Amino acid sequence: MKFHFRILTLLTCLLCATVAFSQVKITGKVVDAAGEPIEFATVRLLGTAVGTNTDTKGLYEMTVPKADTVMVEFSCLGYSTVTRQLIKPEGTVTINPKLYEKTLELGEVEITEYKKQTTTMQGIDVDMLRRTPDASGGSVEAVLTTMAGVSSKNEMSSQYMVRGGSYDENSVYINGIEVYRPQLISSGQQEGMSIINPDMVRKVEFSTGGFSAAYGDRMSSVLDITYREPEAFEGALAASLQGGSLMLGHSTRHYSQMHGIRYKRNSSLMGSLESKGEYDPQYFDYQTSLVFKPTDKLRIALLGNVSINDYRFTPVNRETSFGTSEDVKSFTVYFDGYEKDKFQTYFGAGAVTYKFNDKGTDLTLQASGYRTDELVAYDIHGEYWLDQAGQELGVGKYHEHERTRLKMNVLDLTLRGNVGINNNSISYGLSMRKEDIYDRSRQWQWRDSAGYSLPHIPDQVNVIFTEISSNDLNTTRIAGWLMDTWRFTSSAGFWSLNAGVRLSHWNFNGETLISPRVSLGFVPERNGNLSLRLAGGVYYQAPFYKEYRQQVMDTLGNRNILLNKDIKSQRSIQVILGSDYTFRALDRPFKLTAEAYYKNLSNLIPYEIDNLKLVYSGVNSSKGYIAGVDMKLFGQFVEGTDSWLSLSLMKTQEDLNGVKVPRPTDQRYSIALFFTDYFPNIPRLKFSLKGVISDGLPTTAPHLTRADSYVRQPAYKRVDVGLSYELVGKEHRPTSGLFSHFKEIWLGLDVFNLMDISNVSSYYWVTDVNDIQYAVPNYLTRRQLNVRLSASF
């Protein structure tokens, strides 16, 4: 009996060995034309049911039977199919194919297919940024504001709101490093330029919610930017009536560098504002990106930025007419004084990455530092008249004074890594951040109406508002995260599951946060044109400088700013359900995207919005919700060009002092159109249009809350158009001379605010002696022309 058992065991071992030696393992990485990994690419053995899909790193691995000839096919929606033939393969074979974007030829027009989206991160085409009409100066954010769920109320600013969140609830990353914007910005005139240099951008990814645990504690959105690595000497330059930019890049075998300089001076745009005077804004920005690769496994990267924004304004007068055709009011002011603001920011980061293998296992040690030095200083005196049909409603004087100085240093040290195991991609990280804040501020406002100081108290001269701040703060934040992305194929279709958790601790208030997050994507086997996704989690908005500044009234009526150590992070429990459906109409590709979402909000810190300035109460005293639906139709509205139409419906409400009121970001509807076209007889002449119609936001008078009373601003309506003519291009480049060295040269003409609509950014509140307040609208820019020239080489 023992003899028979040994014979059976020996035969089994021989059979297993025969099977093992009769199989071939095929591994590799699928990338696009730029060398970027392609996720969800299909790898299959032709003529069989054997196949697999690439993971988030573009990696794959499968085992196939040994044969004299093995045909392996690589495919992905939006890319051309590649087939590799293996002759008598043995052992382990590595194939790293490169897939190129798939186009369909229709005469002289090329139509591109669209890739599927199985996560909440969506990609944005970088090339369209260069020819988009943008009053803020050609920022990446200008395209974001046409996306579903995203809105902006100020064309001079790159700030945006996402699905009922505030400007402060959006995080921005460049090369995996979180970056910040100045904190004291209160208007688009002060802001200058976005920290993102569009000439240096290679990839843009954006999420309007439901993002993974790898991203920090923000409740609304993530904008993830990746800068390019030049492959040779290259450059880009641009000049317009708003300013100019220059980018230069160079690379060798182991080293690449890229430098960008931008200058902006949009005094002509500000000249269309109703407050007349001498505008002298100057904005300067320098960025550098250096990458050193001594070996195939080691990568050292440096990123640096210097930004200096000076805003100087000497007002002279202002004349504003508002109301209806039957009830016209006029507001006239004569000014005396000045405003001088300065915002200096410095940012530097370094990262060392070691790649252990080609399966997506790597480790990165990253250090970054951010410093901002901000000064807001103005002394403005004015005399005003408010009339209604020739009848004087109010007359008076006012004096506004502010001296605010903010210095902030943020140091961050992060260790993060990835581990690739079969169809799983595990990511983890640990970070420590030190924040050092110096805050000094003194503000006051005095008003006199009909010879009386407001507030009117007999035998006293009083100011209407006084605020004093003198605070120093040094805190530490620690965070860690762990997540896994698992991609697999079943008989039902393709699945993508991302689950993770983020933990953080802040020593200022002793708060520890646990943030679980999960997303699931599914592409059914029976309908490959449809993709579904479900995402949710617990998201927090960790307080940062402005949120925990609390106003406390002293016995003299002064508002003193104290730091609330009992502050807690705002919490948002989110659920998002979305789908994409790709189809062809008129023999052109389209993609219809729809998402529904609900956010349960608690521990809210109430705030009011004044133009771009958010004024927080400094205490957790509210709760609320956000619910909405976003839809976007993306496709070839015109053959060969990409356009899209977005529609967003949303409602957000909070319980403020026991009263249910709309939140400051309650924008019930938003419609945005981004449209591109070309002239058939002049294909080198391109046309682009960016149009927005969105509901007005609720607002209230200074030093009041929406629980007391509020008004809703008029709807924001704006259309910007641009014409671009290709002077030099791929198909018509001179063979000799100066212009033969250029890849492209474009000459453009933009018309900002084509319909010349007066949009409201905020209100100036006038109070008469009877303490009746009148809301005088502060209008944004009117119609303006811009000429631009851009080139790349």
Predicted regions and their residues:
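Face-selective signature of the C-terminal outer-membrane beta-barrel domain
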Residues: K293-N309, G337-N509, T593-A596, W644
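Surface-exposed extracellular loop regions of Gram-negative outer-membrane beta-barrel proteins
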Residues: N317, E525-Q574, A596-Y616, K690-L704, ...
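Membrane-embedded beta-barrel scaffold of Gram-negative outer-membrane proteins
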Residues: T364-S368, Y378, D566-N620, Y625, ...
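Outer membrane beta-barrel strand-and-loop segments of large Gram-negative receptors
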Residues: E402, L406, V410-T414, K568, ...
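C-terminal beta-signal and adjacent terminal beta-strands/loops
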Residues: V692-T700, Y725-F793
